[in-house]
């Protein structure tokens, strides 16, 4: 019985430590050492602000220094976007339906320049005749107007460039109402008398980030998917160690952070090259090079790709690419987390409050696990009832551990008690707890979600630490109700401080997660009282 309590304590501590460690590992990535990365650059790559990948078929001259930006502004119902006419890159994106901070009127800035750091989405045409491979540097596009506003279901923003040979290039961004994915269309009109060869590249560039504080949920890093590996993280340190270079059918690349993702999805019916590097200016880049294409004289061809910049919503991401929803990282228990999130979302659609939905899903989960809970507490109570007999056996056999062990097992067999009966149900419940942890941590829907009174953001810690304190109190009550007696002084101290330790752990956890644990504990207390009352009616002594 003492071993069961010790096992429970160690198990909970281990799970909490692993969760806390995983949280910090995923959301706090150490800064890569620029000196360790500069040697991996291709010698033909640019040392200017722009990095243009080397074509599969030709070396690229260095591009010119980036000129002062001339931008156009695009406003939709979900975006405010700025596009640099030089290169046609997306250099700033505000998500209009998401606040920067709770209660502020400032929309969330996903892409842009902030705090001396950059986060851009870039694309262009390289190859033998690609304008981005020109010795004069990246092309400066002509635009018909400086601002565009979505008024219907679709908005097309064309950027046009004509090279010295008279070849017309039209780079068009297509925005749609209510959507965070943007279509990219490159139309090449070969007006010359000779064939052209071009190659589309798409990439995301972000300044390497410093490690945040232990409890700060910061930028994670890059990720990619191939036909063999649907989702693989590629952190700043991974980039510093080795440049990514994978050829795949289809695929995607992305930068992921807490709640949001930006990702390029190339054409899926062709072979693409995924690449990465960290530049001397400490910018991390991950991108895709499409296959080189030949455009015959007098003909026209359009190359396409899709760029997503927005919240990590599984169903939306899956519609763009079947594996892109994996950037909503539910950990190795994703197969449990995903249906739990679907259930949570359904409950919210009925109840209208995410806090109430968390309480409801807790009740459902605890009800489904009640048979395991009953088996756990029943086993503990039976072990408690055998304590006098255990003490008698210990006195009878003294230091003869072999005979004491044999006699103990015979007693268990006679009394039909499994000494591990209280531990096995705990092990079965742990995956549920872990899965729910990732649901509460990863779900964009919980960002800035209100519950009651002071709990105005279930994705953030409790500002007044009320929930962690109540959790500690509920854990203390649970200890007092459990029918176990610990005689070892060290174990007594461990049990005494366990509620305090867990309360401290939960001080910085998302309040939605702490709410789940608190409600779970309260339900466990009620279930425990019901189970023990039934056992006492049967004449089984539960508490001493």
Swiss-Prot record:
Transmembrane parts of this sequence: 341-361, 421-441, 499-519
Keyword presence, Chaperone: yes
Compartmental location: Cell inner membrane
Gene Ontology molecular-function annotations: membrane insertase activity
Predominant localisation class: membrane
Region (Disordered): 29-58
Alphabetical UniProt keywords: Cell inner membrane, Cell membrane, Chaperone, Membrane, Protein transport, Transmembrane, Transmembrane helix, Transport
GO CC terms: plasma membrane
InterPro entries: Membr_insert_YidC, Membr_insert_YidC_N, YidC/ALB3/OXA1/COX18, YidC/Oxa/ALB_C, YidC_ALB_C, YidC_periplasmic_sf
UniProt-listed GO biological process terms: protein insertion into membrane; protein transport
Start-end of Polar residues biased regions: 35-46
Membrane-topology annotation of the record: Multi-pass membrane protein
Task performed by this protein: Required for the insertion and/or proper folding and/or complex formation of integral membrane proteins into the membrane. Involved in integration of membrane proteins that insert both dependently and independently of the Sec translocase complex, as well as at least some lipoproteins. Aids folding of multispanning membrane proteins.
Quaternary structure and partners: Interacts with the Sec translocase complex via SecD. Specifically interacts with transmembrane segments of nascent integral membrane proteins during membrane integration.
Family of the protein in this entry: Belongs to the OXA1/ALB3/YidC family. Type 1 subfamily.
The protein, known as: Membrane protein insertase YidC
